[in-house]
């Protein structure tokens, strides 16, 4: 029992094999699922962090590729930086034929990169349009896995960090509501 000054909350017991276990979604990435005791938490967002060149994009693509190939779970890849063509080429260098998965409607690459000519932001920033595009793609392709590359790119496009942060939290809440990993 946890007791605080103004209220008392009762938590379920944590002993026993079925109490408080998190259902995991296997990534199929060699060694990773062992380290994470089965994979990533189902229906939750996981932040993959690291400096440029550490393999965040490769990890995300590997997660989606294996989900489609090994578990028949369609996926969505949202890109803010690289073009879909570059993503397909990079994946091919690892022997992953993502183009075939795109053609089979098992993978959808949503290009959310900014206009190369730049953009003028007027009014309030929000991700409502992007959230709806992702939601539509999830429904259309019956996706179970979603990767967004990269959240950092969103922050770099706008000055109002607190607003972008709020919108990212809205996006994560929506993905959780939908139940994708």
What are these model-predicted stretches?
Residues 71-156:
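Conserved inter-motif catalytic segment of the P-loop NTP-binding fold
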Residues 25-29, 33, 42, 57, ...:
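Amphipathic alpha-helical transducer elements in NTP-driven molecular machines
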Residues 6-7:
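Cysteine-centered motifs
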Residues 64, 135, 168-172:
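Short amphipathic alpha-helical segments and helix-helix/interface helices
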Residues 14-30:
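N-terminal pre-Walker A segment at the start of P-loop NTPase domains
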Residues 157-158, 163-181:
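Substrate-engagement module of ASCE P-loop NTPases
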């Amino acid at each position: 029992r946890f007791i605080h000054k103004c209220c008392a909350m009762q938590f379920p017991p944590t002993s026993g094999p079925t109490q408080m276990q998190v259902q995991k979604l296997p990534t199929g990435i060699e060694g990773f699922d062992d380290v994470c005791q089965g994979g990533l938490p189902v229906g939750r967002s996981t932040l993959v962090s690291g400096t440029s060149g550490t393999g965040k994009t490769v990890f995300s693509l590997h997660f989606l590729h294996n989900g489609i190939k090994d578990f028949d779970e369609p996926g969505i890849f949202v890109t803010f930086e690289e073009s879909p063509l570059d993503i397909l080429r990079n994946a091919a260098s690892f022997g992953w034929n993502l183009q075939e998965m795109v053609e089979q409607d098992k993978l959808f690459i949503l290009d959310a990169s900014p206009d190369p000519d730049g953009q003028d932001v007027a009014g309030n920033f929000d991700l409502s349009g992007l959230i709806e595009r992702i939601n539509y793609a999830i429904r259309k392709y019956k996706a179970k896995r979603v990767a967004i590359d990269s959240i950092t790119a969103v922050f770099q496009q706008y000055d109002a960090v607190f607003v972008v942060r709020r919108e990212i939290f809205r996006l994560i809440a929506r993905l959780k509501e939908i139940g994708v990993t």
